[in-house]
């Protein structure tokens, strides 16, 4: 309680002191010693009208405080200085010292402070970089560093021994004694638990070792960990410094910190109590200083200065009024003497403009330049305007002269000697721009102008051609209208006609060939501009930059030859030769844009004409001209080669696209006219004109492509950059070649599919012709094939011709275009892929044809078995081949003739498929009608049917496939089975049997006698032996077409083999037919096919 009462007493005392201080008179009173001061010496001058700057007298504490917190030492020094100002004598001495150092003797301190405030901005620029004389020149960061170094250089005090109780066992003992260390190394932990390493900011205790010095702490973290910093973070301090400290130690440290704080508060209060008078004195001193500063600001100049200045000003004005006439006359005399001397001194200068003009008009350029340089060397007074005007006239004359010289450099026919003299004169005249570079720019612009002129002329010619074409179209339209009306028009009518007849510009077809001719001439003219001007331009640049101006002159004379010997090595321009090369590259870029746009506009219909190839040849010639010695820079040659490769690539790509487009075009124009055997080079395929047109397209396009690739390959040997482009071009050509074949195959497949659909929609067929096609008007070309089946055969022939002849021929002819970049195995695989594609396509179209013919054959086979006028259950005796069999054979004869004439190489394959289908049709019809029309077959019917089947097999044997043979065996077995069943049923039910005919008496002697399979086969063999050869001779004319590949002498043994197979399955007479079905019966020899 006593401490609280003491605190209350101290606060009351402090409040009472402040109230007394507030009642004091704060006005400034001059000290008694001020009357004893010496008078102040002051120069008479105009008092400054500017307002006094109060801020100049105040020390710059605010700016410093805004940046950093001032140290205790600095605060003490500033307080001492302020206290010293309050005394009168010290103030006077300080003012004198400051006034003497600034050169203003006798000035008061207030005036000096004001002058400093005013002249602060003037002093800013006069600082020599030494010690700063004002606060804003102080490097505050450097000042803070120095203060920190001063603090760290001091030694840390020895830690006082902490009085306290003995620690409990297990607790960390606080440090009792530590050696004093440098301040920059360690500082004491505020909790008195150890020492904090200032570099690593780690706690050092008696039990722990020194932390690692390799660990570095950034400034941001240091500001948060230093406890006397403004940015101190207590949580971060405890988590880092005391991360290993126990809770008991932290509590003990916190208790010690609180007791220390309490002790310090007591000490502060005691300090205020003991030094209360000192604090009051300080407050009084501060108030005195403030009042003195305010007075200084109110009267900065002192008394009497303004009056003295006004008196002196009045005296000066009266003196000027008295002596003014004398001064004027003296000034006029001085001016006259000055003008006279100037005229005498610069008389040559006044004649200089006329002298220079005379020299220029006479062609004495060197004399004019010398006079000009002489005038430039004269040192003229800056205040004489007449001389300036004379020099301005000289400059005007020389400016016109320089313009004349620059104009002469634009002459395209200027020789190198004149050019050298012109450049030398311009260099002596010190032009604003480089004359040599001006000349090079002029020549470069001239080349660009020539290129643009070519473009303008080309557009004008194209426009004239379009107008002529349009006028011709109008006249043609008028003539057609006259012919339609049949009336002769008068002049008036013709004028009305001009107004009436209008032709749409879009409908007018402009002559693409003539336009392409103009485009070719345009590219040729552009290339000629480059070839004729770029090498000369480059040689001129080389001569200029090598210092040998006249050595590359193409227009030389004797004087030029003499000048060549005297030319010295010198550099005429500040630019480099690489910049000239950049000019040429830009020119070639302009040329490239024009050539590429024109080349892409060539009409594709004229692609085989020489316009595009001639343009490429022109660019190639330009490349060869550029490759001559010192003709152009290497970069220009590379750029032109690139242009050649690009337009060649465009041309080849357009050729490839033209081949594919032409392939599609000719595929839509199939005329169905078979070509002669000579036109197809004795090929067995009766092709149309379509494959030959395709061949013509491919050959025309690939020959042009081959020539272009060969030319590019020869140029690529000189440049490695073109190899990649050539490889890309070759790959695209190969793919385009193969795609053309695939596209043609796809078109042939579409044609075949369309023909198949047209045949499938037809309901009635009559000998291979549909009624629809029979009624087709004769609008087709004479000699064209109309029958859809024959057209399918023609498509098959076209496919076979492409597969067997055309693909290999064209591939072997043009494979060397891309063969070097590919392996031989890959090369052969391409051809095999083409052949496989056409083979697969041929199979598809062949299916369409055989399907259409199979319908005819099925109808004929059905008529043969069911509608031939014979009852197979009561057939007459076998006497030979029936007419129905011959009619059936005629169907195959017609097919044979059709295929032989249209696709002879496919004859065996087609007939083999059709015959196999015929046998399958027989088998299908027998199975379908087994319970109806063919449920009963007697012995004579069996012999007749088996005999005719053997006849078919003998005649068509050369086209029989293994599958057809197996089907025939199945058919024979089925017929045998039906016959045996029919005869067995007749024996079992004799009442229902018909009376045997006369022809059957030899076959069946007793109705109740059963007939075995061997007996039926024996009867069939007997008929075959007696009648087969005879029937073959009788129908030799009908079957002659089938005998071409298989002679008649080889046919008789064939049925024997068939019967032997039957006989092998019926060897045991004791076994009935049912038991033999599982042991080799021809019925189960092959699955039945519908």
Swiss-Prot record:
The exocyst complex is composed of SEC3, SEC5, SEC6, SEC8, SEC10, EXO70A1 and EXO84B. Interacts with SEC3A and EXO70B1. Binds to EXO70H1 and EXO70B2. Binds directly to B1L. Component of the exocyst complex involved in the docking of exocytic vesicles with fusion sites on the plasma membrane during regulated or polarized secretion. Involved in polarized cell growth and organ morphogenesis. During cytokinesis, involved in cell plate initiation, cell plate maturation and formation of new primary cell wall. Probable component of an exocyst subcomplex specifically involved in autophagy-related, Golgi-independent membrane traffic to the vacuole. Regulates autophagosome formation and autophagy-related Golgi-independent import into the vacuole. Residues 1058-1082 have a biased composition (Polar residues). Keywords: Cytoplasm, Exocytosis, Phosphoprotein, Secreted, Transport. This is Exocyst complex component SEC5A. Residues 18-128, 759-783, 987-1010, 1046-1090 are annotated as: Disordered. Its main location: cytoplasm. Disruption phenotype: No visible phenotype under normal growth conditions, but the double mutant sec5a-1 and sec5b-1 is male gametophytic lethal due to defect in pollen germination and pollen tube growth. The modification Phosphoserine is found at residue 180. Belongs to the SEC5 family. The keyword Flavoprotein does not apply.
